[in-house]
């Protein structure tokens, strides 16, 4: 399988010596589980054009300091790319900003939280355990969070 990673943000300067970029972090993480996956990286944040949907096998969209409501020239084409990929049934995963831009592109609503930044560790209740999660899910999970934007309306047909 070939995974196309769409880079939408740059790693903050203080940690670039240890973590060069988000695509590298994801390649390292995913390759530990499946070393046979091939990767292609497209950096929209650095002006690289989005690929043609035809032939793509799977897409991962990284995090970014941008918000879906920001007026950057790469956000609208990325949203169209997401819609085109969804229409072509190409599997997509969004991390942080990636899931927010996917939600907005597919008909959901994302806002800047009126409470400001959410930073720290947060616990979430697991409401469903789909087959692809292995069928053995915990009742709750705790994960580190750092965000100020949130999806407040899911796209049609989406579930959490």
Residue ranges and their predicted role:
Residues 106-160:
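Pocket-forming structural segment of enzyme catalytic cores
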Residues 10, 46-48, 99, 117, ...:
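Residue-level detector of flexible, active-site-proximal loop/helix-junction positions
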Residues 1-73, 77-80, 84-88:
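N-terminal beta1-alpha1 cap of cysteine-dependent amidohydrolase-like domains
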Residues 65-130:
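Cysteine-nucleophile active-site neighborhood
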Residues 49-54, 101-103, 152-155:
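Short loop/helix-cap segments at secondary-structure boundaries that form the rim of catalytic
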Residues 24-28, 100, 149:
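Active-site phosphate/pyrophosphate- and oxyanion-stabilizing loops and adjacent acidic/basic residues
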